[in-house]
């Protein structure tokens, strides 16, 4: 038996090589891997000695040789293949263990294009693909996590086809991922990220019980190991819908730096939000906005879930808590609650990935765009359009309202008072309806809107929403502006003595 080992990631390769040697494998290797194995006492033959052909062009050509690919690709059950192999002195290679040049790591560490180009692996993917194609005769490995499993299987002497099949699938996933990253990088560097093709590649984290509905299948996939590093289940398992709501809640609660922010989300939209002097007070005020919708919702905590906050949350049923951190006493509070799910990022404050791009599936394809972010200076650069300026406290509330609006389904309007959301209308086909629905809900909750501020994610097309806001005592408004009737909106604000600011940036969310 013969194995070819050629790896960039040397983790576990010595132990793996020794086990193969003990099992009677002749080991071939290249360059740095050959040297590393030899230094660690493993009997190994360099590929150039095996092929009788030297490495060429500063190592660019090492394994691209008929004796390598013929040794991998010929079918052991095909008499014609066996005959050709003998005639051409091609020896079988029964196991291929390859992982690839660190292209992605190089692009992160360096902007030198020559260096980046040299870290595009050619021979490695070719060997992986060859071995995967002939998976019935050749075992292919590209992940150090599989070394132990393969050795155990080899020792048992019973290598079923399903085991080989899974290694084959993993190999093609690996090379596809590698090539996709290269293509995306080149398009990012030379075509602004929008080339003729776009590859979206994620790694599975786990299967969900089902998708959005019980008859659908679902799973969570991640970019750059984000969830593996920043999402730990402490109680319960996340469903598909939990994950989308967690995403919405986390995005909002994490948008205020280190502030003790609490966001409550239901079906992707905020039904509560507050920033008060501490997290307990933030939760109390966030819940007031719509305690009915908060039932069974998702609570995001920009800080630590402690015992006091846990006791307060435990007064009603919430389905999910996502917190930057969770202490043991807080977990104990929920021991008797079977249905609640608790997740943490094990950090001081909530963490976002800040993915640069966003996409949505549409029938027959997908639409792809730069991610929408509320700019750091977006509110600071907002232009005062009215005669009246907002007070210092109103400005704080306006910024909160503006950010909530940016994370809420269009059309929306958001009312904030003293650091807490007091009313919200979202997902409406007209902005005036959103304004009216928000006010009606606030009245139902017994909330006083007098002195609050108002934000909208897009411009007001008419003055009607301003007229409506005046009836409940709105003192200041922030919106993008850009309507052909902006002058009417400004006039209405001045009539009611409101402060009005235009940011110049729209935040539609569909």
Curated annotation (Swiss-Prot):
The IMP cyclohydrolase activity resides in the N-terminal region. One of its GO terms (cellular component) is cytosol. Keywords: Hydrolase, Multifunctional enzyme, Purine biosynthesis, Transferase. The keyword Nucleotide-binding does not apply. Belongs to the PurH family. GO terms for molecular function: IMP cyclohydrolase activity; phosphoribosylaminoimidazolecarboxamide formyltransferase activity. PROSITE patterns: MGS. This is Bifunctional purine biosynthesis protein PurH. Pathway: Purine metabolism; IMP biosynthesis via de novo pathway; 5-formamido-1-(5-phospho-D-ribosyl)imidazole-4-carboxamide from 5-amino-1-(5-phospho-D-ribosyl)imidazole-4-carboxamide (10-formyl THF route): step 1/1; Purine metabolism; IMP biosynthesis via de novo pathway; IMP from 5-formamido-1-(5-phospho-D-ribosyl)imidazole-4-carboxamide: step 1/1.
